[in-house]
Amino acid sequence: MSSIKSLTTRQQEVFDLIKRHIESTGMPPTRVEISKELGFRSPNAAEEHLKALARKGVIEIVSGVSRGIRLLTDIEEPENEGLPLIGRVAAGEPILAEQHIEATYQVDANMFKPQADFLLKVYGQSMKDIGILDGDLLAVHSTKDIRNGQIVVARIEDEVTVKRFERKGSVVYLHAENEEFEPIVVDLTQQPYFEIEGIAVGIIRNNAWM
């Protein structure tokens, strides 16, 4: 068995879910059950995390079996594994898939409330009026529980944007905090791929968190 490597926050959640499911039911969960429990868009997202866990040597995937997951080791949650910096993301893929992680910053996720799950580099001046500036690293808490008025990280196709969230019925408005920018309007009945990845919980600027 390969040596254990530190897990990302999301990978730890998947591992813990598998362990709990085995302890409570005597069998591992299916990809569909993992997706439903952790709020993934599809079982394919769960599969990507399972493959990452297998590469890190903490589970074994048995091919051709819906519950073909076997734990290879028990692990403790790391005290401070750092936060992944997310780069360009392809539509339909999990934002925390390994191929999207450009670097890892040794920042304690618990410095932010709620806890941060990843970092996203800010490009442009669309949010400058509330102090989110070009080049900042935005700390993001992964959640689908969004309220109007919150600063969110949204994905439209393969574009990731940081804006203030407002929803009216089936229409979402993503507002800039700069009068030079018009809001982005998303009709949920027409847009084939739109997803909220999380909420902003802090900013890192010049190695200082804010």
From Swiss-Prot:
<dbReference type="GO" id="GO:0006508">
    <property type="term" value="P:proteolysis"/>
</dbReference>
<comment type="subunit">
    <text>Homodimer.</text>
</comment>
<dbReference type="GO" id="GO:0009432">
    <property type="term" value="P:SOS response"/>
</dbReference>
<keyword id="KW-0742">SOS response</keyword>
<feature type="DNA-binding region" description="H-T-H motif">
    <location>
        <begin position="31"/>
        <end position="51"/>
    </location>
</feature>
<dbReference type="GO" id="GO:0004252">
    <property type="term" value="F:serine-type endopeptidase activity"/>
</dbReference>
<comment type="similarity">
    <text>Belongs to the peptidase S24 family.</text>
</comment>
<dbReference type="InterPro" id="IPR006197">
    <property type="entry name" value="Peptidase_S24_LexA"/>
</dbReference>
<keyword id="KW-0678">Repressor</keyword>
<dbReference type="GO" id="GO:0006281">
    <property type="term" value="P:DNA repair"/>
</dbReference>
<dbReference type="InterPro" id="IPR006199">
    <property type="entry name" value="LexA_DNA-bd_dom"/>
</dbReference>
<dbReference type="GO" id="GO:0006260">
    <property type="term" value="P:DNA replication"/>
</dbReference>
<dbReference type="Pfam" id="PF01726">
    <property type="entry name" value="LexA_DNA_bind"/>
</dbReference>
<dbReference type="Pfam" id="PF00717">
    <property type="entry name" value="Peptidase_S24"/>
</dbReference>
<dbReference type="InterPro" id="IPR036390">
    <property type="entry name" value="WH_DNA-bd_sf"/>
</dbReference>
<keyword id="KW-0068">Autocatalytic cleavage</keyword>
<feature type="active site" description="For autocatalytic cleavage activity">
    <location>
        <position position="126"/>
    </location>
</feature>
<keyword id="KW-0227">DNA damage</keyword>
<dbReference type="InterPro" id="IPR006200">
    <property type="entry name" value="LexA"/>
</dbReference>
<dbReference type="GO" id="GO:0045892">
    <property type="term" value="P:negative regulation of DNA-templated transcription"/>
</dbReference>
<keyword id="KW-0378">Hydrolase</keyword>
<dbReference type="GO" id="GO:0003677">
    <property type="term" value="F:DNA binding"/>
</dbReference>
<dbReference type="InterPro" id="IPR050077">
    <property type="entry name" value="LexA_repressor"/>
</dbReference>
<comment type="function">
    <text>Represses a number of genes involved in the response to DNA damage (SOS response), including recA and lexA. In the presence of single-stranded DNA, RecA interacts with LexA causing an autocatalytic cleavage which disrupts the DNA-binding part of LexA, leading to derepression of the SOS regulon and eventually DNA repair.</text>
</comment>
<dbReference type="InterPro" id="IPR036388">
    <property type="entry name" value="WH-like_DNA-bd_sf"/>
</dbReference>
<dbReference type="InterPro" id="IPR015927">
    <property type="entry name" value="Peptidase_S24_S26A/B/C"/>
</dbReference>
<keyword id="KW-0804">Transcription</keyword>
<dbReference type="InterPro" id="IPR036286">
    <property type="entry name" value="LexA/Signal_pep-like_sf"/>
</dbReference>
<feature type="active site" description="For autocatalytic cleavage activity">
    <location>
        <position position="163"/>
    </location>
</feature>
<keyword id="KW-0238">DNA-binding</keyword>
<protein>
    <recommendedName>
        <fullName>LexA repressor</fullName>
        <ecNumber>3.4.21.88</ecNumber>
    </recommendedName>
</protein>
<keyword id="KW-0805">Transcription regulation</keyword>
<feature type="site" description="Cleavage; by autolysis">
    <location>
        <begin position="91"/>
        <end position="92"/>
    </location>
</feature>
<dbReference type="InterPro" id="IPR039418">
    <property type="entry name" value="LexA-like"/>
</dbReference>
<keyword id="KW-0235">DNA replication</keyword>
<keyword id="KW-0234">DNA repair</keyword>
